[in-house]
């Protein structure tokens, strides 16, 4: 194979100091077979033994590499000078055969040499991207919509030095070929370029992934304008976890027979099932838009009671803690010559809405936010699709579209920008959807229930109760799920159970997802205990004690069994959630009395008879040392009493005491008068 290799090195040192700062890779040295023989890291040249191919790729069903190339392709390599000092090469592939070929699964190095690998697997039309770890089942992952074909790999080059590398296809470079989601079809003589980026890191494989996905944002943009994310008035959406999207003619919004609005009843119902909706979105346009000469703004005006009635519903919803969204259809040309941004401004002004669903959009553009800002602060743009990294500066929220049914388990968009508010779109009418709620919970984001399609099956309340359980944990620990302490896929002692870590300022959460139908209970992952913290299972509400094994500390996890026939359906799976919390509370039982001690007084204490649940109320107390009568507040309840300390609705600590069935309810000695003998 003919190869033209151009090595031109100009070092360029930027002035920005990264939080992930590492020595940049100055060069990757190749042998004559395009194998990596050494890495120049600062002033140190590290030899690789054995060497590894620079890249691997597939043509059709066959796998090749730079060391063992396809006879149908040639490629050249050109060094790019980057302002950030990181290493970038352009790999140019040319189809030199007389056949039409499909080039795909282009990734750095070789699968055998990597600590972690991301590339395609299978033939799914929308979702093939998988993350591979040694001796583990591959994990299907979600990546940005402009990067489904990406390849990622990490290798160790020395005791503490590692290389993370990324390949990205240059869509605009395709000549005499066709771009598909995962493949590039090259006709004879066709060409396509891939960019290969490489940077150094140390630590576990997740550190390299975080550098590439979060620090470099997949090299989609060189600088990120964070101004929208810094705005206090827009931060509320990142702490929101349940929304419903419905038609304006839905029975839950308006009763045609009675001629009255029913939305507030729907919102009240939701409070008992899943803690209520942070957002409700009303859709009066598609699919009726286009049936007559009215444009989208006319359709809003023609609703019962007009825009004033919608404004009233928005106000009533906010009283219940729910923001009110309207929709916008950019494809509506209509018959009204009014500028769309002015039309949107007028609609927001008339309805006092709190946000806009941007139909068919995956980004916003500042014109949309500017139009909203003229009305009032805090109006959020919410796109139908998920913004790619270079579009994220224009919008603060988006969704995992329901076009991707049975979505991948791990969403790497969450790693890219943890502050970006993500909602998974789920539909109730098709089948039970516990997996939708479970995977959203595992990834630390919310759920949009799209109930446009008619149907409220008899199992809806059961599913909503599961959503309530996941959403409570998300809400009460929201700052962990929006902080930059996300580490995906911690090492576990067993396969088919996955653990994500979410570090915050004073506590750490672990979300766990299982597809083991037989259930699981046992030591699962490694932890670092200390005297100031303890471990609590927030899903099962029980205290946990780490166990030492092989010189390491391990924590026990537990997941429920589920029918094996549900594997592969949207109702598969089980979850757990474990927290390492600061020790603030101490509790004990003394007959009929619960003794509570707290080292903090700023917040609130809640006592639950059994597990916390939105369908019941907790006993709410001041944060102080106190004694509580169990029978007075909970009657004859026997079982676990869950005691929580919260500050501004955020869980700080939890402890549990068990009142064993049949325990005598003796009063405290100080409260019982002395009994004199009768004779």
Language-model features, listed with the residues they occupy:
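Aromatic-lined carbohydrate-binding/catalytic grooves of carbohydrate-active enzymes
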Residues: 254-365
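Short, aromatic- and glycine-rich surface loops/edge beta-strands on solvent-exposed regions
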Residues: 91, 562-571, 607, 636-657
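C-terminal beta-strand-rich structural cap/linker in extracellular carbohydrate-active enzymes
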Residues: 549-585, 634-637
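Carbohydrate-recognition beta-sandwich/jelly-roll modules
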Residues: 28-263, 267-279, 455, 459, ...
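Short, well-ordered beta-strand segments enriched in hydrophobic/aromatic residues
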Residues: 87-95, 507-515, 594-596
């Amino acid at each position: 194979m003919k190869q033209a290799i151009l090595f031109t090195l100009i070092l360029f040192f930027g002035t920005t100091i990264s939080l992930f700062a590492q020595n940049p890779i100055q060069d990757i040295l190749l042998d004559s077979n395009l194998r990596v023989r050494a890495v120049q890291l600062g002033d140190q040249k590290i030899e690789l033994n054995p060497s590894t191919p620079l890249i691997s790729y597939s043509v059709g069903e066959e796998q090749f590499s730079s060391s063992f190339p396809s006879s149908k392709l040639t490629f050249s390599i050109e060094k790019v000078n980057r302002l950030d000092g990181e290493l970038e090469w352009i790999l140019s592939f040319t189809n030199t055969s007389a056949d039409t070929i499909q080039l795909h699964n282009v990734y750095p190095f070789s699968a055998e040499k990597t600590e972690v690998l991301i590339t395609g697997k299978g033939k799914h039309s929308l979702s093939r991207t998988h993350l591979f770890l040694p001796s583990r089942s591959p994990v299907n992952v979600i990546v940005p919509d402009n990067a489904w074909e990406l390849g990622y790999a990490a290798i160790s080059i020395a005791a503490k030095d590692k290389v993370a590398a990324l390949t990205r296809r240059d869509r605009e470079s395709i000549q005499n070929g066709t771009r598909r989601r995962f493949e590039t079809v090259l006709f004879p003589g066709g060409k396509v370029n891939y960019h290969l980026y490489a940077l150094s890191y140390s630590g576990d494989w997740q550190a390299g992934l975080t550098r590439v996905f979060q620090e470099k944002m997949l090299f989609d943009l060189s600088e990120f304008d964070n101004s929208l994310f810094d705005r206090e008035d827009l931060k509320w959406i990142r702490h929101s976890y349940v929304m419903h999207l419905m038609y304006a003619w839905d029975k839950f919004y308006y009763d045609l027979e009675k001629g009255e609005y029913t939305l507030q009843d729907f919102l009240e119902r939701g409070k008992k099932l899943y803690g209520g909706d942070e957002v409700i979105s009303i859709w009066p346009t598609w699919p009726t838009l286009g049936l007559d000469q009215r444009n989208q703004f006319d359709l809003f005006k023609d609703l019962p009671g007009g825009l004033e009635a919608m404004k009233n519903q928005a106000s009533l919803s906010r009283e219940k803690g729910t923001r009110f969204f309207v929709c916008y259809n950019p494809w509506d040309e209509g018959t009204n010559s009014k500028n769309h941004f002015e039309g949107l401004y007028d609609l927001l002004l008339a309805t006092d809405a709190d946000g806009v669903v941007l139909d068919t959009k995956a980004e916003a553009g500042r014109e949309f936010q500017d139009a909203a800002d003229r009305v009032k602060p805090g109006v959020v743009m919410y796109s139908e699709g998920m913004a790619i990294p270079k579009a994220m500066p224009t919008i603060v929220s988006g969704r995992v579209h329901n076009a991707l049914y049975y979505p991948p388990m791990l969403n790497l968009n969450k790693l890219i920008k943890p502050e970006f508010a993500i909602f998974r779109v789920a539909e109730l009418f098709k089948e039970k959807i516990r997996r939708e709620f479970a995977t959203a919970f595992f990834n630390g984001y919310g759920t949009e229930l799209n109930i446009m399609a008619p149907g409220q099956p008899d199992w809806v309340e059961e599913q909503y109760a599961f959503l309530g359980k996941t959403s409570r944990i998300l809400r009460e620990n929201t700052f962990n799920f929006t902080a930059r302490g996300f580490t995906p896929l911690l090492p576990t002692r067993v396969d088919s159970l996955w653990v994500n870590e979410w570090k915050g300022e004073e506590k750490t959460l672990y979300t766990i997802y299982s597809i083991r139908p037989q259930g699981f209970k046992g030591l699962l992952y490694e932890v670092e205990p200390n005297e100031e913290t303890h471990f609590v299972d927030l899903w099962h509400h029980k205290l946990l004690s780490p166990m030492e094994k092989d010189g390491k500390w391990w924590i026990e996890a537990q997941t429920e069994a589920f029918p094996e026939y549900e594997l592969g359906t949207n109702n598969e799976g089980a979850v757990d959630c474990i927290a390492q919390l600061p020790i603030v509370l101490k509790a004990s039982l003394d007959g009929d009395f619960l003794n509570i001690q707290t080292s903090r007084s700023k917040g609130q204490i809640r006592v639950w008879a059994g597990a916390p649940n939105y369908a019941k109320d907790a006993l709410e107390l001041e944060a102080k040392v106190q004694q509580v009568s169990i029978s007075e507040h909970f009657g004859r309840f026997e079982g676990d009493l869950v005691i929580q300390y919260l500050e501004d609705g955020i869980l700080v600590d939890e402890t549990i005491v068990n009142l064993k069935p049949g325990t005598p309810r003796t009063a405290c000695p100080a409260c019982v008068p002395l009994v004199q003998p009768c004779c």
